[in-house]
Amino acid sequence: MLKSPIIGISCGDTNGVGSEILIKSINRILDLDVLIVFFGSMKLLTFYDKNNEHLLRFNLISNISDIKKNKINVFNCLEDDFKINPGEITPYSGNAAYSSLDCATNFALEGKIDILITMPLCKSNVKQPFVGHTEYLRDKCGVSQNLMLL
């Protein structure tokens, strides 16, 4: 029997559409034979889960061994005292997007997750020396060529 792959999802821009996309697709995602780890915060998911429809489907973890099937496992890699302002570009939202991407990438490089999905970020808001996800991953992984799949 094959083990279920562990899919890591970076949160993207906290004021962007990433968390909202995840919330709206939870039922389809959890029907798959996979384990999901969201790199962000419980605050972020509960904000976009407007009617608390999915609250019982979230599982806060501090270690990869705590993940549960049929849950969105949340690895908290963001500060809890931030404001969510949908549609606004703020310094925090850019920093949070980078922190989430970096944390998720480290988990992938350490073999703790099998697949990495990156939610959208505002490139002009991420004050880092890379153009976007693809270039960041290329440099972080130390490779010269890369390929993006949509």
Residue positions per predicted region:
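Anion-binding alpha/beta catalytic cores of soluble intermediary-metabolism enzymes, centered on
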Residues: 1-150
